């Protein structure tokens, strides 16, 4: 849309230049006393009038602000762009990212990337092609303020599930677990020098415990090596086995995150058949009950997959009823041609609306925006404050002697 608008405005300029050349032959061009040709007055006059017309335009359609500001009485959901056909609609202005800085101006970004390569660790930032990787890994490199964060993905880079929105590689028989991964992960986090880390996992349905014991070992190793670190574990549903959920919830993590991903109606078309909307709610609710509310729980919703407004509202209600404390909402972007297509681009005002509604429902924190992802670093600043406030109050122990990790089979 923005490109077509730009080209449309350029055509009159080109046409005016052609007309001016036709109307004023070289032999008849006005000349000054020295015989030199005067400036092309026709072009100057046209450009003056053109600039004046743009400056006085009141339609709101000829500027970037016009795309972002909604007319009065127009609901935010009505401003979304869609339905879409691949190749027919460019990204709207609010999804255009700034050009990344050069390597010399991103020391934090380069340090984290080099660290991951050396230790052969995977990150969901790269595997899932997250658009915020420069901002999160850079941690405010350009401004010099901010904290670099990264999402480390444990248990390899191959997932046994095939969700239709995700670009992580899928395999029925992934490589065996690396017994050295807990130590490598702890070393990598220590080298990063970060205050907040997100540890996520691929689903490993090929393992009897879904990899729960391995996750616990990774969390424990990271916390022992980095005692002051705040750690968020973004994990799967472990086949819906609540004993495995308890095992992970009883580890020394700070935030238990599990994404519901989308509204209930479209879940079968979006997520792998082994995942379900109700199973995800059951996992989140059980964590809250098992820890007696001491554990901060978090989930995420994607927009642009065919959901309706009331369905998003109901999903927020369901999450809050399950005891979820923090939620993020972001725009789904198709990572490759083999993944689900985007049904619509939600307007920034719609994300603002959902943030307000979520906070009104009682969520302690909500990050809502077109480029927000479940591990988006903007949310972690606020979550850190919540966790530090809770540290001043002695929380009941959630560990259980029966939850000692056993080897993943």
From Swiss-Prot:
Record has Iron-sulfur as a keyword: yes
InterPro entries noted in UniProt: Aldolase_TIM, Elp3/MiaA/NifB-like_rSAM, LIAS_N, Lipoyl_synth, rSAM
GO cellular component: kinetoplast; mitochondrion
Enzyme Commission number: 2.8.1.8
Location in the cell: Mitochondrion
Keywords: 4Fe-4S, Iron, Iron-sulfur, Metal-binding, Mitochondrion, S-adenosyl-L-methionine, Transferase
Binding site for [4Fe-4S] cluster 2: 159, 163, 166
EC category: transferase
Record GO terms (molecular function): 4 iron, 4 sulfur cluster binding; iron ion binding; lipoate synthase activity
Catalytic activity: [[Fe-S] cluster scaffold protein carrying a second [4Fe-4S](2+) cluster] + N(6)-octanoyl-L-lysyl-[protein] + 2 oxidized [2Fe-2S]-[ferredoxin] + 2 S-adenosyl-L-methionine + 4 H(+) = [[Fe-S] cluster scaffold protein] + N(6)-[(R)-dihydrolipoyl]-L-lysyl-[protein] + 4 Fe(3+) + 2 hydrogen sulfide + 2 5'-deoxyadenosine + 2 L-methionine + 2 reduced [2Fe-2S]-[ferredoxin]
BP GO annotations: lipoate biosynthetic process
Domain Radical SAM core: 142-364
Needed cofactors: [4Fe-4S] cluster
Family, as annotated: Belongs to the radical SAM superfamily. Lipoyl synthase family.
Note: This protein may be expected to contain an N-terminal transit peptide but none has been predicted.
Protein name: Lipoyl synthase, mitochondrial
């Amino acid at each position: 849309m923005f490109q077509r608008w730009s080209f449309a405005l350029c055509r009159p300029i080109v046409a005016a230049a052609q007309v001016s050349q036709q109307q004023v032959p070289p032999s008849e061009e006005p000349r000054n006393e020295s015989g030199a040709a005067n400036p092309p007055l026709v072009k100057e006059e046209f450009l003056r009038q053109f600039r004046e017309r743009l400056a006085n335009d009141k339609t709101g359609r000829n500027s970037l602000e016009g795309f972002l500001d909604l007319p009065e009485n127009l609901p935010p959901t009505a401003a979304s762009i869609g339905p879409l056909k691949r190749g027919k609609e460019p990204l709207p202005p609010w999804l255009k990212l700034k050009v990344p800085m050069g390597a010399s101006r991103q020391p934090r970004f380069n340090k984290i990337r080099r660290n991951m390569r050396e230790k052969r660790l995977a990150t969901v930032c790269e595997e899932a092609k997250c658009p915020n990787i420069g901002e999160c890994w850079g941690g405010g490199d350009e401004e010099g303020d901010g904290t670099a964060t990264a999402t480390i993905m444990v248990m390899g880079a191959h997932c046994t599930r095939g969700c239709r929105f995700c670009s992580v590689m899928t395999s029925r028989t992934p490589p065996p677990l690396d017994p050295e991964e807990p130590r490598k992960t702890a070393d990598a986090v220590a080298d990063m020098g970060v205050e907040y880390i997100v540890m996520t996992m691929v689903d490993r349905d090929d393992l009897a415990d879904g990899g729960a014991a391995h996750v616990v070992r990774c969390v424990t190793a990271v916390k022992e090596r980095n005692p002051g670190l705040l750690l968020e574990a973004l994990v799967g549903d472990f086949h819906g086995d609540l004993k495995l959920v308890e095992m992970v919830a009883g580890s020394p993590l700070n935030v238990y995150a599990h994404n519901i991903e989308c509204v209930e109606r479209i879940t079968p078309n979006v997520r792998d058949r082994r995942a379900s909307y109700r199973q995800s709610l059951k996992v989140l609710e059980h964590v809250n009950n098992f820890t007696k509310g001491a554990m901060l729980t978090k989930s995420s919703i994607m927009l642009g997959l065919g959901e309706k407004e009331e369905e998003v509202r109901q999903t927020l209600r369901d999450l809050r009823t399950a005891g979820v404390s923090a939620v993020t909402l972001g725009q789904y972007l198709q990572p490759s041609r083999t993944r689900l297509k985007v049904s619509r681009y939600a307007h920034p005002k719609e994300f603002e609306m959902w943030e307000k509604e979520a906070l009104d429902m009682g969520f302690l924190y909500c990050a809502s925006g077109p480029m927000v992802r479940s591990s988006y670093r903007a949310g972690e600043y606020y979550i850190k404050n919540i966790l530090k406030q809770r540290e001043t109050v002695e929380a009941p122990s959630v560990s259980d002697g029966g939850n000692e990790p056993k080897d993943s089979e």
